Regions:
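Phosphate-coordinating loops and pocket residues in cytosolic domains that bind phosphorylated ligands
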Residues: 35, 40, 76, 83
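Acidic, glycine-rich loop-and-strand cores that form catalytic or ligand-binding grooves
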Residues: 78-96
C-alpha cells in the first residue's frame, strides 16, 4: 500500500492576515454603499402596503354598494364591511360573512379613515401617514383612494 503525502509550505496553509483584512475592507465598502439604499425601503414598503389596503377596502366597498345600493355612511364606517350595520342607509342585502375578514390597520397601526360623502369623491378612504396629521410630505403624506396613482 502506497501512502501519498503532500508537502505544504507555510505559505499554502491558509489565508494570511493581510488577505483577510482586504476582504473585510471590501465588505465594509460594499456595506457603506448598500446599507443607505436599503434603509430607505421600509418607508416605501409601508406606503405600498397602505395603497394596497386602500385599494382592497375600496373594492370591498364597491361590492357592498352593489349589494345594498349605497355605500355605508360615515357613522357606519368601514366596520360595515365586517358586521352588518344598523341605521341608514339600511343594508338590506348585506352579504353573510361580510365583505372582508377583518379590517386592516394602516402601516402605522392606526385605523383607516372613511368619509361618505368624501371630500375628494363619493367616498374617501385614507390614512394620515406616519405623523398622523393631515397633509405632509414623503412618509408623512396622506394616502387616500383619490391619490393612489401618484
Amino acid at each position: 500500500m502506497t501512502h501519498f503525502t503532500r508537502n505544504y509550505s507555510t505559505r499554502q496553509m491558509g489565508f494570511t492576515i493581510i488577505e483577510i483584512m482586504v476582504v473585510v475592507i471590501i465588505l465594509g465598502i460594499l456595506a457603506a454603499i448598500v446599507v443607505p439604499r436599503v434603509m430607505d425601503r421600509p418607508d416605501a414598503a409601508r406606503i405600498t402596503k397602505g395603497k394596497q389596503d386602500i385599494r382592497a377596502l375600496e373594492s370591498a366597498l364597491n361590492l357592498y354598494k352593489l349589494d345594498n345600493y349605497d355605500y355605508p355612511s360615515t357613522e357606519q364606517g368601514l366596520e360595515a364591511l365586517v358586521q352588518k350595520p344598523a341605521g341608514d342607509p339600511e343594508a338590506r342585502n348585506w352579504k353573510q360573512g361580510g365583505y372582508v375578514d377583518r379590517l386592516p390597520k394602516d402601516p402605522w397601526q392606526r385605523p383607516y379613515q372613511y368619509l361618505k360623502p368624501g371630500v375628494h369623491g363619493e367616498i374617501d378612504i385614507f390614512t394620515l401617514g406616519a405623523d398622523g396629521q393631515q397633509g405632509g410630505e414623503g412618509v408623512n403624506a396622506d394616502i387616500g383612494n383619490w391619490s393612489l396613482d401618484q
